[in-house]
């Protein structure tokens, strides 16, 4: 088993280059794939089995193109790896989301409120859609379709009136967008894979 890391070997910042390689790689962004290939050969790795999401697996494709024998296993709660029906971790995400919303129903009902929950998922809406289909919420909003806040408010109001406990629940995917709007980012700084941190659309929906 090799150690896990959030570093993308093909795009390593100068400050993150290992000490013994700093003299060799001096650019602001460095591709250390040659070192990865060298280490795999040194370790006698015949097959590499990367387990992860689209970032991990996309680099697995790079190594495959370099001649490494790769067998990829999709593992991401987002369930957003193309070419596969199921990702390890997604069922746990759905289960936990359902448990969380069920735990909050008493609070929502006792105060007769609208409950808005923002869930992970980045650009895919599975983490909001599947729990809603399983009864965790009345409505969900996903990144694949821009939504009109007025329509959502009307639907939630109707759901609330039909509920004897006078509450309704909406699951909002973190990548969801208002009609004509853009994705909401909590932090514009990016991680090693170039992703900015999504977050905040749930708060905006609550305010509306």
Regions found by a protein language model. Give the residues of each.
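Short glycine-rich anion-binding loops that position phosphate/pyrophosphate groups of nucleotides
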Residues: 7-8, 53-55, 76, 175-177
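Short, conserved acidic/polar surface loops in the N-terminal third of protein domains
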Residues: 12-16, 59-63, 82-84
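Short beta-alpha connecting loops at secondary-structure transitions
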Residues: 79-81, 85, 188-193
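Accessory alpha-helical/coil subdomains and C-terminal extensions
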Residues: 29-32, 38-41, 47-52, 60-62, ...
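Short alpha-helices
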Residues: 65, 76-79, 86-91
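Short gly/pro/ser/thr-enriched loop/turn and capping motifs at secondary-structure boundaries
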Residues: 9, 57, 76-81, 147-149
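Short acidic/His/Gly/Ser-rich catalytic and metal-binding motifs that mark active-site loops
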Residues: 10-14, 80-81, 178-183
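Glycine-rich nucleotide/cofactor/substrate-binding loop typically near the N-terminus or early
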Residues: 1-41
């Amino acid at each position: 088993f090799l150690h896990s890391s959030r570093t993308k070997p093909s795009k390593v910042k100068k400050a993150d280059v290992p000490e013994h390689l700093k003299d060799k790689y001096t650019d602001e962004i460095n591709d250390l794939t040659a070192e990865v290939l060298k280490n795999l050969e040194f370790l006698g790795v015949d097959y590499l089995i990367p387990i992860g999401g689209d970032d991990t697996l996309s680099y697995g494709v790079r190594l495959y193109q370099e001649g490494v024998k790769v067998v990829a296993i999709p593992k991401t709660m987002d369930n957003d790896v193309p070419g596969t029906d199921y990702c390890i971790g997604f069922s746990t995400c759905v289960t936990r989301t359902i448990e969380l919303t069920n735990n909050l129903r008493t609070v929502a009902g006792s105060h007769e409120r609208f409950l808005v929950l923002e869930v992970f998922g980045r650009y895919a809406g599975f983490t909001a859609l599947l729990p809603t289909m399983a009864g965790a919420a009345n409505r969900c909003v996903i990144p694949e379709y821009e939504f009109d806040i007025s329509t959502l408010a009307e639907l939630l109001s109707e759901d609330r009136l039909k509920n004897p406990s006078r509450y309704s629940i909406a699951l909002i995917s973190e990548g969801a967008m208002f009609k004509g709007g853009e994705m909401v980012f909590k932090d514009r700084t990016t991680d090693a894979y170039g992703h900015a941190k999504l977050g905040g659309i749930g708060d905006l929906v609550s305010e509306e």
